[in-house]
């Protein structure tokens, strides 16, 4: 009365499929978030807006979104008397723009392009990842 039981280990295949799907949905969501950040950005020359990029680390399953442009920090958090934490320079200062023109300012109001994009899209991204992973 013996029965033959045969065991097949598909764990490597399953884990590979999970890895692939995670990276696909991360790429999709990071791209959407990058696009929303760009739509939220103030535009003068377009340099800062166009500097935002995303990168997915396939091994770590992490998406990075940001800008190497120093102005992106100032746009996000503000400067001078408008700095988001109130810790900016007070009293104003003079600067020269790219055309060499002189300006006086008390700071730059924060645009919060990244924060607003994240706040707007967070729940949608969570739902998208959940729905995408259900298909396994």
Residue ranges and their predicted role:
Residues 1-72, 85-136:
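Short, Lys/Arg-rich flexible segments
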Residues 79:
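Small/polar-residue-rich segments within soluble enzyme cores
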Residues 74-76:
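His/Glu-rich zincin catalytic helix
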């Amino acid at each position: 009365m013996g029965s033959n039981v045969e065991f097949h280990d598909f764990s490597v295949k399953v884990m590979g499929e999970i890895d692939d799907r995670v990276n696909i949905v991360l790429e999709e969501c990071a791209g959407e978030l990058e696009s929303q950040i760009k739509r939220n950005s103030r535009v003068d020359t377009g340099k800062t807006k166009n500097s935002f990029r995303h990168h997915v680390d396939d091994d770590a399953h992490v998406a990075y979104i940001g800008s190497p442009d120093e102005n992106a920090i100032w746009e996000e958090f503000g400067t001078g008397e408008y700095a988001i934490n109130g810790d900016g320079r007070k009293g104003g200062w003079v600067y020269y723009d790219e055309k060499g023109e002189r300006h006086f300012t008390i700071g730059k109001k924060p645009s919060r392009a990244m924060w607003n994009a994240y706040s707007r899209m967070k729940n949608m991204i969570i739902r998208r990842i959940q729905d995408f992973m259900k298909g396994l």
